[in-house]
């Protein structure tokens, strides 16, 4: 299944990189690459792996080694990555 990252999800990755990069640019790169890798590896082969999402019609993949959740929506031909949220942030009402 093809993964498609929304503009908001890409902005989330950029914000994560900028925040972590203030202290350690190499760590920022590792975290962002790990998030992308986890999404592509886990979701492309098994889109139902995530739990039902808090927003209707979405699912959430909890990233085990990192404090992030990837919100996504399964479409007919692809999987849409909606957001990449830190677990301590308030969850949006809509995606």
Predicted feature locations:
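A short catalytic or substrate-binding loop motif that flags glycine-/basic-rich loops and adjacent residues
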Residues: 62-65
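Short, exposed beta-strand "edge-strand" segments with a Pro/Gly-rich flavor and a Y/T-containing core
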Residues: 1-5, 86-89
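Enriched for short, Lys/Arg-rich terminal
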Residues: 68-95
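Basic, Lys/Arg-enriched alpha-helical interface segments
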Residues: 2-58, 94
